[in-house]
Amino acid sequence: MIPLSHAFSLSIILFILGLIAIIVRRDLLFILLGLEIMINAAASAFVIVGSFLGQSDGQIMYILVITLSASESAVSLALLLQLYRRYHTLHIDNISEMRG
């Protein structure tokens, strides 16, 4: 069995990578990918704790989080598609300048 500290370290590293993707990139698609990485890192922490405690609650929470993440992805990708059709770019700075 993997030690708890190693598993949490992996989850924290994934969360930080997602956060860096959100902060550094200015493209909406990459920001959404970073958000999904962060959500999956948090969901994996539920599984890690549930596995450590010997309960299935962590796995149930993971299924719930993944379901919510899938619906969030569907809505955000639909909005992303509409933004691209209207402004022909996914760059955040260009879209915020076109406010009117």
UniProtKB/Swiss-Prot annotation:
GO biological-process terms attached to the record: ATP synthesis coupled electron transport
Keyword field contains Transmembrane: yes
Name of the protein in question: NADH-quinone oxidoreductase subunit K
Main location: membrane
Highest taxon above the source species: Bacteria
An annotated Gene Ontology molecular function: NADH:ubiquinone reductase (non-electrogenic) activity
Record EC number: 7.1.1.-
Gene label: nuoK
Oligomeric and partner information: NDH-1 is composed of 13 different subunits. Subunits NuoA, H, J, K, L, M, N constitute the membrane sector of the complex.
Reactions performed catalytically: a quinone + NADH + 5 H(+)(in) = a quinol + NAD(+) + 4 H(+)(out)
Parts of the chain that traverse the membrane: 4-24, 29-49, 60-80
PANTHER family: NADH-UBIQUINONE OXIDOREDUCTASE CHAIN 4L (PTHR11434:SF16), NADH-UBIQUINONE OXIDOREDUCTASE SUBUNIT ND4L (PTHR11434)
